Amino acid sequence: MSSGDSNLKRRRGGNTGQSSKSYNTWTDYEEDLEESGEFNQSIKKTTNTSSATLTSSEEKGSLLDYSKRCILKQDNKSRPIWVCPDGHIFLETFSAIYKQASDFLVAIAEPVCRPQNIHEYQLTPYSLYAAVSVGLETNDIITVLGRLSKLALPKEVEQFVRQCTQSYGKVKLVLQKNKYFVESAYPEVLEFLLKDSSIATARIKPTLEESVVDPKTGFIINKEVVTGAQISGGLQANQSLDPVLKNDALSNLLEEEEEDTVNNSDQHFHSFEIDPQQVEEVKKRCIQLDYPVLEEYDFRNDTVNPNLNIDLKPTTMIRPYQEKSLSKMFGNGRARSGIIVLPCGAGKSLSGITAACTVKKSILVLCTSAVSVEQWKYQFKLWSNIEERQISKFTSDNKEKISNVAGVTITTYTMVAFGGRRSAESLKIMNEITNREWGLVLLDEVHVVPAAMFRKVLTVTKAHCKLGLTATLLREDEKIQDLNFLIGPKLYEANWLDLQKAGFLANVSCSEVWCPMTAEFYKEYLINDSQGKKKLLYTMNPNKFRACEYLIRFHEQRGDKIIVFSDNVYALQKYAKGLGRYFIYGPTSGHERMSILSKFQHDPTVRTIFISKVGDTSIDIPEATVIIQVSSHYGSRRQEAQRLGRILRPKPKSDGLYNAFFYSLVSKDTQEMYYSTKRQQFLIDQGYSFKVISELPGIDQEVNLKYSSKQDQLDLLAQVLGEGEDSGKNEILEEDFDDITRGAKKSKSSAPTVSRTTGGSTRALSGGNDMNYMEYQAPAIYKSIPTQHALFKQRAKNKQ
């Protein structure tokens, strides 16, 4: 084990044993270095006490002064990035080499915020792990960072990159001819791993059939001839370094004497075979030894599993960013497991289908709901030449026989992970799924399932390659990092604004419309203690209703197609029936849904439909150009992005600046304003801006708007106050994403459940439940009641 390797093993306190230490952020790493006394002293000597030692206010997030620690290069104006000692990187989007620099940073760092002019990235161990997984070498990362940076590359950053990349990506788990091999170009790494008793026990001694065995180590030696995998659709996958290192557009910055590429075409790989039953244990031990394995599939040389006759249709066109994402997946003639992050409406499904057409083996698609299963089947038939008989669905309502040879099976996470008793028909299909050797598993919305569900799904299915697809790779319980090893590293993440500028996404105007509460409604809002009734009052605010009707009239006159979203079923029905429009929610039958959507798409007289949260992810209506949101799921950032995605698909160019419109109607001076601000955060980080409309121009002159008179408003208030507590609750579906994260427990009642109350704290109301995907209950500290002021204690006592 090298000295660099040993730096990752820290002795703590008086403990005599060593424990593996991983870092979630660069700050954690730096703090650990300082504690251990290994921080680079030469760097500290170049700064005075005030700049080297952060004050308490700086540690809490105040501005940091690096002026005395960082020296600008003379030609800094021609270089696009700022590399800070804390691992943050800032990119100027107006640079002449922005595109190449952006591609490089996406490969090595995590995007934090990407507005119009300056992008922020953060170096993390996992982002660097992903970088080496697609072929980048340690020295290449450091060299290119140094050349692109306006500042001399901080020594702390260089040391961090070396620490994180020296072991990542050097060990691969390959499935060849139905045998598992641990493979590496570094025999000393394999020797180190075999010193572990668990890995040594799992090893299978090689045979001298077609392999060359090193007599000293006993490793199998293969001479790799790298040709690259031909991706369906004509793309040749890159097999070594990221193209940014070889791009001529980097001009003089990257055209120096040092070579930027490494020729791997004549490289020898060493490997040893392991017992298939002990693969999970080997992966676990490799992670603990700081050598996480990459999983790659030599699909072209797989003669054991039958080929699937599937190709993209000649009319199917792959976009450049989809090609780029797939080039990260296919290299060295193999398919590597990982995650692709693309915006809503940018063609995640087509990327997955293209991967399936490239591998040409049995495909398993895992979705979040039965509606998504139908969508995936439609997408396979739309983009590929696969035959109907080769596609099978496995849901609670459709249990179709799986093809005896190769085929595509589409099911849900809950169907595969279900641990209870099954029907004979379901059990037979499930046995086929667990016993088959799948070439590729596509995991749709890969971020929504908790770690326990992931491990079970991935344990019961045997797959050569796994590809996760998502638009919002968000988790706040740190479980998102587990995906690096359960699925694989993040292979690619697209920039929303760049795709919008290129015409691949609609140019959306995002607005927050403030709707003042009427005096009568606001009075009831203030004096009512029921959270459900408060929510119903600000949702049914007459001024919000009038704003919604006004916007519908305005955009219908323009010829737009409008979707109005409401999580609250009572409000959904009240709005839709009051305005004479079709509506869809949980209990709406499948036939009626398809009928309404068909009319919306093809009937010019049907320009507006109302939809509950069933439409967040399960509809595909390219014709929609306007979203109006009257009720939402508290502070869910994910839902905001998903709803925006309903209108992100490319639109015909319009005379104005925007060709799509997103309105969020918010009752002024209520909790809804706080939730709205929280919901927008993810989209703001992607570069979108929300303008506030405090008053819709012309709304007071619009005639015949409902609830314009005082008497109509009082009648509506009486109806709202007369409703029960359940009317103020949001619709929560049996197949809701959040149900999946909570275990998807179904109600035993035979009656259809369209809404229910969920227990929790104020963190849940602010969107915490959407973002905290946890396997366990939150610590008691989060549920404790804070100390109350004496005034409020007395008030509570008086109420009793």
Swiss-Prot record:
Residues 1-27, 743-769 are annotated as: Disordered. Induction: Up-regulated in a dose dependent manner following exposure to both UV light and cisplatin. Unaffected by exposure to hydrogen peroxide. Residues 17-27, 749-764 have a biased composition (Polar residues). Coiled coil: none annotated. One of its GO terms (cellular component) is transcription preinitiation complex. GO terms for biological process: DNA damage response; nucleotide-excision repair; transcription by RNA polymerase II; transcription initiation at RNA polymerase II promoter; UV protection. It catalyses: Couples ATP hydrolysis with the unwinding of duplex DNA by translocating in the 3'-5' direction; ATP + H2O = ADP + phosphate + H(+). It is found in: Nucleus. Residues 329-491 form the Helicase ATP-binding domain. A motif (DEVH box) lies at residues 444-447. GO terms for molecular function: 3'-5' DNA helicase activity; ATP binding; ATP hydrolysis activity; DNA binding. Residues 546-704 form the Helicase C-terminal domain. Disulfide bonds: none annotated. It comes from the Eukaryota. Its main location: nucleus. InterPro entries: ATP-dep_DNA_Helicase, ERCC3_RAD25_C, Helicase/UvrB_N, Helicase_ATP-bd, Helicase_C-like, P-loop_NTPase, XPB/Ssl2, XPB/Ssl2_N. It is an enzyme of class 5 (isomerase). Its EC number is 5.6.2.4. Keywords: ATP-binding, DNA damage, DNA repair, DNA-binding, Helicase, Hydrolase, Isomerase, Nucleotide-binding, Nucleus, Transcription, Transcription regulation. Component of the 7-subunit TFIIH core complex composed of XPB/repB, XPD/repD, gtf2h1, gtf2h2, gtf2h3, gtf2h4 and gtf2h5, which is active in NER. The core complex associates with the 3-subunit CDK-activating kinase (CAK) module composed of cycH/cyclin H, cdk7 and mnat1 to form the 10-subunit holoenzyme (holo-TFIIH) active in transcription. ATP-dependent 3'-5' DNA helicase/translocase; binds dsDNA rather than ssDNA, unzipping it in a translocase rather than classical helicase activity. Component of the general transcription and DNA repair factor IIH (TFIIH) core complex. When complexed to CDK-activating kinase (CAK), involved in RNA transcription by RNA polymerase II. The ATPase activity of XPB/ERCC3, but not its helicase activity, is required for DNA opening; it may wrap around the damaged DNA wedging it open, causing localized melting and twisting that allows XPD/ERCC2 helicase to anchor. PANTHER family: GENERAL TRANSCRIPTION AND DNA REPAIR FACTOR IIH HELICASE SUBUNIT XPB, RAD25/XP-B DNA REPAIR HELICASE. Belongs to the helicase family. RAD25/XPB subfamily. This is General transcription and DNA repair factor IIH helicase/translocase subunit XPB. It comes from Dictyostelium discoideum (Social amoeba).
